[in-house]
């Protein structure tokens, strides 16, 4: 047989084997599904009524934080609502106060510490609401009010779960803490004060569970199942002041000069935005997002996602163009917030959101070279970065197990949160930080976050309470 024919046969065999490998991976993927068609545990009408009453009281309090303390009376009313509606917690837990940011502590039977978190401040009621934002209304089986999603329902569920366990005489397997900030929405000092207290006491947490992710619909193209999005990391925040100063002096009319600080700063901003500085990459949590959803996708998409390693380069080049949300998960982003000054001296604040801090530092060096070209000075003014957790941990597996038991119809997936949470302050005192609450949101609910007509369905309240109970009690199985 001629050598050429042998070579062609070998090439065809290799191509055939490769294609077979791709197809087999796609065909096998559905067998890796963890969701089940079995129904969720049924709700209890009496519990729904009790839980609704408490949450109505909580969301009626206008806990909008500002430096003038405009709503101090509303905050005080909110704390009284908690004291009255969670009697076992009030009686048996240790309560710490940090100028409005509160912390409950319940002693357990081991040295392990578990921290549950949800802030209690809310954003103002801007826009045209169908019902008053702070006069809770029940409509079509849902409670409409500011804070129902972000994040008084999760806070209610955490408090109620612990309150009911305490009332039953349950002996906690670990030390349980519940922390709630009064000024998270403005990136305030509430949780940093609690963090300082943890450091002072030498406390370290096996798990910190904050808000951030939820149960959502249509997370991936072609995926019909709902997804429980558990953030194991959030993008870091770095602020830099970029300043340009006029190098030559002269009267604009009598002795004009070409140098102009505004023009140089504008040229600097333009080049930073147009340059390909920020490296695109799949971090483990973003890769985990795609791999987890692959078994649930239609065949063509499943063919690609089930062979993620092979198609990674192609996906990097395409995905960022498809969705701004996905693009934000793949690289550092920069936002120039303002320009202040005049032709003699002007400045801008550059806001960087990074995936990994070490990558940002390399990218900043590239930006400094551009800054030098335009004689712009860069000064870092703020750094806020939390070490990533992993979705391949005991803590994540425990949460996934709870979700599989209580929400068998839902995919549990890691992801990268592009927003921010209070949990970012606790990276040095936690073994694992997860950002998730079991609030089940349809597309309208998701769109109502920080928007008009925010609402939560009453049937979801008992599920949330049971979730936090299970998170606590499953530590017995460790």
Q: Could you say what each language-model-derived stretch is?
A:
Residues 131, 173, 204, 224-225, ...:
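Short, solvent-exposed loop/turn segments at the edges of secondary structure
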Residues 121, 272-277, 368-376:
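A common structural junction motif
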Residues 1-12:
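Feature marks short, highly hydrophobic, charge-poor N-terminal signal-anchor/signal peptide-like helices
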Residues 95-96, 108, 216-218, 278-344, ...:
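An extended, acidic, His-containing surface patch that forms the Zn2+-binding/catalytic region
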Residues 251-256, 357-363:
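Short, conserved charged micro-motifs
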Residues 143, 149-229:
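Acidic/histidine-rich catalytic neighborhood of metal-dependent amide-processing enzymes
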Residues 192-197, 252-277:
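A short core secondary-structure module
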Residues 15-148, 168-172:
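Acidic/His- and Gly-rich active-site-bordering loop/insert found
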